[in-house]
């Protein structure tokens, strides 16, 4: 792993032969509040690519960051139709995914196999969910965040999942324990059931000053799921 990141394992199950599917990396929206996030994420991608098989790249699912946290806070104070807020949060992930693709120099794709000539890409989450009735199969509400969406992507691809967040898990434990502690969303244990490989990573360094108030952390205990 990169010297910029620390990592750990949440789940590993033997599945015989290694999968050629790209490793799904959920880039926590809270990381987007760091002024150095493109360099950090780029270093993480490079480290994963070095350690993986030559034909296995990465597929990034980018969280919504501070904008989604603002939607969540506003909805708690002035409740709106759940379906509308659900769609709004997913639309924000489309914007953060577009930005990540631009700043990292990666293709933005609606399906992993559309990354022509590039093993690593950023997923256009709204476009991906809009295909094959995926959006309709996803529960509506704040119990589902980019954590669960990334798990659904990994399950669909038969891939592993790396959760890149601002802080490490509060304690060792299974997915249900992490959901109970607020490190992943409440639906994540269900979404992640098919996955054989789940790991985490977080930056080793103290974050530089946030960019104009962006960022998804609501303190260490909440961190978590943006």
Whereabouts are the PLM-identified features?
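Nucleotide/pyrophosphate-binding catalytic subdomain
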Residues: 1-210, 218-220, 225
């Amino acid at each position: 792993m990169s010297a910029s990141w620390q990592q750990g394992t949440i789940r590993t199950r033997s599945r015989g032969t290694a999968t050629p599917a790209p490793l799904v990396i959920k880039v926590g929206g809270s990381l987007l509040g760091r002024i150095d996030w493109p360099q950090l994420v780029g270093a993480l991608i490079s480290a994963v690519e070095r350690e993986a098989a030559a034909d296995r790249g990465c597929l990034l699912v980018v969280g919504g960051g501070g904008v989604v946290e603002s939607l969540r806070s506003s909805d708690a104070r002035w409740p709106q139709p759940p379906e509308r807020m659900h769609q709004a949060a997913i639309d924000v992930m489309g914007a953060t995914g577009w930005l990540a693709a631009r700043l990292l120099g990666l293709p933005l794709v609606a399906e992993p196999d559309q990354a022509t000539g590039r093993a690593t890409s950023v997923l256009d989450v709204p476009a991906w969910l809009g295909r094959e009735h995926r959006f309709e199969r996803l529960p509506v509400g704040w119990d589902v965040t980019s954590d669960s969406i990334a798990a659904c992507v990994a399950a669909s691809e038969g891939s592993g999942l790396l959760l890149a967040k601002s802080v490490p898990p509060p304690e060792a434990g299974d997915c249900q324990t992490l959901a109970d502690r607020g490190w992943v969303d409440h639906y994540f244990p269900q979404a992640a059931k098919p996955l054989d490989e789940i790991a985490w990573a977080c930056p080793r360094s103290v974050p530089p000053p946030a960019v104009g108030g962006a960022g998804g952390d609501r303190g260490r205990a909440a961190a978590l799921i943006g």
